[in-house]
Amino acid sequence: MPSVAYEGSDCNTGHGCDTTVKINGGSANVIIGSKGVARKDDPLEDHTIAKTDLGLPFPPPPLCIDHPNQKVNEGSASVFVNDRPIARVGDSVDISGQITEGESSVVAGG
């Protein structure tokens, strides 16, 4: 079973410029490892994306542009926190990437 993600867990982005990004939200009242449990729809920190990853012509500069308002878009089908599916290592995020870091002592299936 995969480890449960938390606020501050790393995600890979699946694109250039910022190759990793952190989960920027979590439960205020369900805590693991002193951090809030991450859930589906929790936000990711703002980051940049390569223009070429968006199918935009390159050059001109800048190579990287802002890529805000991204979120966790997958979670457990059977384990919920605050009525939302918990996020786990391997679950997908809006940026074509996955959660890559979680609390190894807390696992959840489904």
PLM region spans:
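Intrinsically disordered, low-complexity proline/glycine-rich segments
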Residues: P2-G110
